Amino acid sequence: MHTIKPPPASHYDEMLAWTGAGPAGVQVQRQLQSSGGQVQTQTATVGPRDHYAPYSDWLTRTAEQSLTQRRAQADLLFRRIGITFTVSGDDSGTERLIPSDVIPRIITADEWSYLERGLTQRVTAINHFLADIYHEQKILKAGLIPREQIEGNAQFQTKMIGVKVPHDTYVSITGVDIVRNNDGKYYVLEDNLRVPSGVSYMLMNRKMMMRLFPELFLKQTVRPVEHYPALLLQTLREATDIDNPTVVLLTPGRYNSAYFEHTFLAQQMG
């Protein structure tokens, strides 16, 4: 019996399923903290989730030294390209490398289909909500949301009341922060609707994985993501009624925490 400690910045726990018993698993101990603050040690059998099995087999066969070297190569690559970010609230303004993880978070096709439907529904609802707030305000008149909660919000723009936006679309791009809890269900932490950032890190991380771990992509059917900038450009062009519009990506400058993303997306969109 031993205690498994996941490596830093790793999806190790995500890969494992606490099965309770089973010959294929490994006996481990984990510590659980109750709502009252008491810490209990639980013994259980752990093994890879079904959709992680092929990756787990590869990870078992791969030498630790090889993984360490590839992780170092990833850090060196990111540093050379300048893929850094600053943490909000960090007074020192220290730039940090994007964290890389040799254990990817694997989402099955069925899970992604479920998430896609839910996110589409959520963004549609947000657009309907904003359209109502700036026009008929039925939700306020019905008392479903206190009027002062809307009108007292710093982001509420009175100048937008009655303004017709193209295609009734108030939110064209959104970054929805999602987590999966211990019960296996997905939860939304927050909706980033104004200037969502972070997609460039995902795109570069995928590119890095394909470069340093090509054998993984030969054995797995992984959906592509590199077409995102083209979809973004199409979305921005469709946000106006002007024929053949010119799209411009503005940035506060190189000292902004998301400057790498601004330059990356501008270059990718041409």
Predicted regions and their residues:
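Preference for protein termini
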Residues: 1-270
